[in-house]
């Protein structure tokens, strides 16, 4: 069970959004690379990074900040936001990124995801961001008529490394993970699922360590870590013991 600390990038800074709203951004660190190193020093073994501007623009916007993060930490990094082509994927993986996260393109062009999995085995994840059970795209700005499980099943057997499942209604508001939908997704597909959105306290960490949650690959934490609601050492110890 992996706890992924999150760095969301907006205008070169480390921020957290409330409900995915770019106008409701709280700046937590003006130096994302320093934040990445701090997470490594706290004992985290992975890092989850999102280029928020890139998610809306459809291409990398905070590239310099991401490159600085890759230089600052020895931990493997997964990146989402604005990665829409095979060239984008190859570019980032060549710079030392461990895993790319494909979101909008997974809805718009599922065949590209399958092609990417063949070209870059084990290095392609799919980000499924949901609102009311339906998938949202373009930085959560647009709703689709595609169901979460319906989309996930399109990639069964394709070699997708993981599905990062985000409940938009809980993201950045410390409401707790949507356990029913997250575990329901994990039960419906063989692809490893990572929970994102809503992780609020050590109670959620303890819930992650419960036997029925061990089917998840892990969970992503942002605001709860930055606000001190989760003790890194205690959380990592609990999850490692549950592995």
UniProtKB/Swiss-Prot annotation:
Catalyses which reaction(s): 1-(5-phospho-beta-D-ribosyl)-5-[(5-phospho-beta-D-ribosylamino)methylideneamino]imidazole-4-carboxamide = 5-[(5-phospho-1-deoxy-D-ribulos-1-ylimino)methylamino]-1-(5-phospho-beta-D-ribosyl)imidazole-4-carboxamide
Keyword Isomerase attributed: yes
Active site as annotated: 8, 129
CDD domains according to UniProt: HisA
Pfam families, sorted: His_biosynth
Keyword Translocase part of the UniProt annotation: no
GO MF annotations in UniProt: 1-(5-phosphoribosyl)-5-[(5-phosphoribosylamino)methylideneamino]imidazole-4-carboxamide isomerase activity
Alphabetized SUPFAM superfamilies for the sequence: Ribulose-phoshate binding barrel (SSF51366)
EC annotation from Swiss-Prot or TrEMBL: 5.3.1.16
Main localization of the protein described in the UniProt heading: cytoplasm
One term under GO cellular component: cytoplasm
Pathway(s) it belongs to: Amino-acid biosynthesis; L-histidine biosynthesis; L-histidine from 5-phospho-alpha-D-ribose 1-diphosphate: step 4/9
Source superkingdom: Bacteria
Keywords per UniProt: Amino-acid biosynthesis, Cytoplasm, Histidine biosynthesis, Isomerase
Subcellular location: Cytoplasm
GO-annotated biological processes: L-histidine biosynthetic process; L-tryptophan biosynthetic process
Family of the protein in this entry: Belongs to the HisA/HisF family.
Protein name (database record): 1-(5-phosphoribosyl)-5-[(5-phosphoribosylamino)methylideneamino] imidazole-4-carboxamide isomerase
This protein's encoding gene: hisA
């Amino acid at each position: 069970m992996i706890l992924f600390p999150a760095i969301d990038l907006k205008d070169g800074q480390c921020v957290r959004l409330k409900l995915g709203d770019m106008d409701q951004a709280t700046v937590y660190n003006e130096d994302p690379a320093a934040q990445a190193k701090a997470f490594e020093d706290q004992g985290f073994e992975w890092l989850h990074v999102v280029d928020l501007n890139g998610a809306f623009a459809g291409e990398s916007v905070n590239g310099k900040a991401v490159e600085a993060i890759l230089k600052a930490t020895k931990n493997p990094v997964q990146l989402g936001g604005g990665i829409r082509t095979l060239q984008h994927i190859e570019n980032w993986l060549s710079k030392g990124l461990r895993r790319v996260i494909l979101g909008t393109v997974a809805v718009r062009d599922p065949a590209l995801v399958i092609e990417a999995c063949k070209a870059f085995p084990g290095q392609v994840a799919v980000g499924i961001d949901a609102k009311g059970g339906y998938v949202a795209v373009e930085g959560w700005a647009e709703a689709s008529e595609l169901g979460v499980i319906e989309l996930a099943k399109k990639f069964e057997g394709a070699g997708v490394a993981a599905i990062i499942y985000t409940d938009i209604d809980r993201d950045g508001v410390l409401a707790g993970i949507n356990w029913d939908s997250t575990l329901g997704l994990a039960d419906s597909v063989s692809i490893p699922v990572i929970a994102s959105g809503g992780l609020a306290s050590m109670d959620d960490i303890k819930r992650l360590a419960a036997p029925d949650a061990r089917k998840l690959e892990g969970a992503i934490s942002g605001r709860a870590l930055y606000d001190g609601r989760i003790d890194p050492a205690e959380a990592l110890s609990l999850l490692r013991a549950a592995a």
